[in-house]
């Protein structure tokens, strides 16, 4: 994997490009800041491969595979003999293997000596550096993060942060020893994990460690800042930005920085300003799971933004007779072919199509958001975009409670109107 730094703006972050994955055509190139597609069990949640290709234009994508979401596939992938990308029929895309699913909350604890716990479908499995690298050789990812201890967040003790940093150094050295000798991983790129919780001195030690081994790393993976899942959207911004800013300033400019989690759009922009290059799509996925359509505006010429909600709850009865698309002007399949009323009906009747349509819209909206980010970085106007997005009316998170389809937040049954039933019959799925 090769990273080319193209532009460093004064106040808006940087532009670059990723390319050089050995097994793909030389035309596979990704402009940064960019997104890695979050997956579960090897697939983008709710979307078939064909729908995903319709959404992305069948171009190569950066695909993120988490260990806790794929560990149950290990024996099957070994039997396939074609690596994880071949097994899940995504050979045309770049595969990135990480330890944790950023959309799933981490289970704290279980810090046994010389192992890292991973919680998959079959429960907890402890990985040593040796067993982890054996799995990596079977999966043969294009890019991967070595085994590390990133189990820290804003509430971690100093002792836990220190153990995280010390254990990570040991794991990484053991993994690199295997990597250097492996014939199966000759074309794979490795990301250096930066850990240490919210302790600047430990983060500095972590940076110094990966810099001693800089020839082994194609980029850097900043971890241990939240507990994944919705915690990334609720994290205290100031301490996180302080740590990320400090880390990015210490790392070399010429290599990409990865930071995953379901961060709010505002926090994503602040992280871009501080030098983070690559994020993931766990945020639109979690919004889909909450039955919400992304609605925030990234067009700074939109004067109606102060009256605009950042997202729409499509199970809310107020949409029962709204026969317009999710977002005015959106050109995604869901918005051009379907309506809020129809999708509201689908949620009421618990149809599988409801989250499919919502995921199509949310991914499209998020990809368009990142196109806007790249434009603003090029013009050095990300600050204007941050101010614009901060003007939105923020829809309450409802204390993390996901509303049951067909009911309001207080549990009252939502009944369909006759017009919705007519619309449901009229629309072709």
Curated annotation (Swiss-Prot):
GO cellular component, one term: cytoplasm
A GO molecular-function descriptor: metal ion binding
UniProt keyword list: Cytoplasm, Metal-binding, tRNA processing, Zinc
Subcellular location: Cytoplasm
Binding site for Zn(2+): 330, 332, 335, 361
Cofactor: how and how many bound: Binds 1 zinc ion per subunit.
Assembly notes: Heterodimer of a catalytic subunit and an accessory subunit.
Protein name: Queuine tRNA-ribosyltransferase accessory subunit 2
Originating organism: Culex quinquefasciatus
Higher taxonomy: Eukaryota, Metazoa, Ecdysozoa, Arthropoda, Hexapoda
């Amino acid at each position: 994997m090769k990273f080319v730094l193209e532009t460093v703006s004064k106040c808006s972050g940087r532009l670059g490009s990723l390319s050089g994955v050995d097994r793909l055509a030389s035309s596979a190139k990704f402009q940064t800041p960019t997104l890695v597609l979050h997956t579960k069990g090897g697939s983008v949640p709710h979307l078939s491969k064909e729908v995903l290709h319709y959404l992305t234009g069948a171009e190569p994508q950066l695909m993120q595979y988490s260990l806790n979401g794929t560990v149950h596939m290990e024996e099957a992938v070994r039997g396939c003999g074609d690596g994880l990308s071949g097994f899940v029929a995504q050979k045309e895309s770049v595969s990135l293997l990480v330890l944790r699913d950023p959309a799933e909350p981490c289970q704290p604890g279980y810090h046994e000596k010389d192992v890292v716990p991973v919680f998959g479908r079959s429960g907890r499995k402890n990985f040593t550096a040796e067993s982890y690298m054996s799995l990596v050789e079977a999966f043969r990812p294009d890019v991967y993060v070595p085994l590390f201890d990133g189990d820290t967040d804003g509430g971690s003790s100093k002792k836990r942060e220190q153990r995280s940093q010390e254990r990570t150094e040991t794991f990484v050295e053991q993994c690199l020893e295997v990597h250097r000798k492996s014939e199966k991983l000759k074309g794979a790129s490795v990301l250096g994990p930066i850990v240490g919780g919210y302790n600047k001195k430990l983060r500095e030690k972590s940076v110094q460690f990966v810099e001693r081994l800089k020839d082994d790393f194609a980029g850097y993976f900043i971890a241990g800042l939240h507990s994944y899942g919705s915690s990334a959207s609720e994290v205290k911004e100031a301490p996180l930005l302080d740590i990320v800013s400090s880390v990015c300033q210490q790392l070399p400019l010429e290599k990409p920085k990865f930071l995953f989690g379901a961060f709010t759009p505002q926090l994503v922009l602040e992280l871009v300003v501080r030098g983070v290059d690559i994020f993931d799509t766990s945020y639109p996925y979690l919004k889909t799971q909450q039955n919400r359509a992304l609605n925030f505006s990234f067009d700074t010429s939109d004067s109606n933004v102060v009256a605009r909600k950042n997202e729409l709850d499509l199970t809310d009865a107020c949409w029962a007779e709204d026969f317009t698309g999710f977002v005015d002007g959106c050109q995604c399949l869901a918005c051009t072919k379907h309506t809020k009323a129809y999708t509201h009906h689908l949620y009421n009747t618990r149809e599988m199509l409801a989250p499919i349509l919502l995921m199509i819209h949310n991914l499209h909206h998020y990809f368009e958001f990142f196109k806007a980010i790249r434009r603003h970085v090029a013009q050095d106007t990300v600050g204007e975009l941050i101010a614009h997005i901060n003007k939105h009316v923020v829809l309450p998170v409802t204390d993390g409670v996901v509303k049951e389809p067909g009911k309001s937040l207080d549990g009252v049954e939502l009944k369909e109107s006759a017009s919705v039933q007519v619309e449901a019959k009229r629309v072709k799925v």
